[in-house]
Amino acid sequence: ILMMMQSILGNTRKADITFYASGRIDISARVAKHLQLSRGDVLDIMIDQDEFYLYVRLRSPNGRHEAMVFPTNKAGNHFRTSSSRLCTAILQECKATAKARLCVGEPTENEYGKLLPIITKYLL
């Protein structure tokens, strides 16, 4: 008799960044630390061939901007932002409908500053 055993936890890797169909983007403390995020920074995603890179487009600019980050609580280092355009692009790339829970790779630098590759091929 062959029993099919299954792990309750399955994949225990937590997402670094989560994109929702509503336009909400949740950013982990790990990503915030790599990008040195602070309240009011504006995020963007750059595409190079099939690679997607998260970076800080503007550091605490004046006025209201799409994808401007804010901390989710006083003590933590998690951030949240909102951008329908960024979410739509990522959800389409991942072939997801409601949300895409993703990891990021090791940061690289270029003329735009620090870039974090978003691993879109592997949904959590």
Residue ranges and their predicted role:
Residues 30-53:
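Acidic (E/D-rich), amphipathic helical modules within compact regulatory domains
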